[in-house]
Amino acid sequence: MMPFDIRVGQGYDVHALVPGRKLILGGVEIPHDRGLLGHSDADALLHAVTDALFGAAALGDIGRHFPDTDAQFAGADSRVLLREAARRVREAGYEIGNVDATVIAQAPKLAPHIGAMVANLAEDLGIARGRCNVKAKTNEKLGFEGRQEGIVAQAAVLLWRASVGDAQD
């Protein structure tokens, strides 16, 4: 038995850019002529982090907990979903160590908004800002991201808990 149960989770999300929607990433509304299409607010960054949390705790994925077939999640604020995911992960006995995420978008430039995204992640997860990181990358005009047809987000999280027995409980 290890003295600590340490878990790593990986999350991924992608949404199409379409006219007539707000662009929300990391809980921040970003000025742009298009937004992300989805059942909720389509915040790809928070969805990737949420998926990484559930994965690390072996609790399934975002679709299992917040299905896009459930009307109660139509237009949902992804910050609310992230806070609930963090609550469920803690309920399972885990603490959140850190989060590292990457958003891949050709446009708009995301660098001016990274600080606000990190602040939202830290607040929603109940951890220090220094334990949250968000990076923005372009796809060098390659693929659907480069053609500005959509935005991708990837996230990794570290969870831990002091082991008192089998991690399969």
From Swiss-Prot:
Pathway involvement of the protein, from the record: Isoprenoid biosynthesis; isopentenyl diphosphate biosynthesis via DXP pathway; isopentenyl diphosphate from 1-deoxy-D-xylulose 5-phosphate: step 4/6
Site (Transition state stabilizer): 39, 138
PANTHER family, per database record: 2-C-METHYL-D-ERYTHRITOL 2,4-CYCLODIPHOSPHATE SYNTHASE, CHLOROPLASTIC
EC number: 4.6.1.12
Protein function: Involved in the biosynthesis of isopentenyl diphosphate (IPP) and dimethylallyl diphosphate (DMAPP), two major building blocks of isoprenoid compounds. Catalyzes the conversion of 4-diphosphocytidyl-2-C-methyl-D-erythritol 2-phosphate (CDP-ME2P) to 2-C-methyl-D-erythritol 2,4-cyclodiphosphate (ME-CPP) with a corresponding release of cytidine 5-monophosphate (CMP).
Protein name as catalogued: 2-C-methyl-D-erythritol 2,4-cyclodiphosphate synthase
Membrane-spanning ranges: none
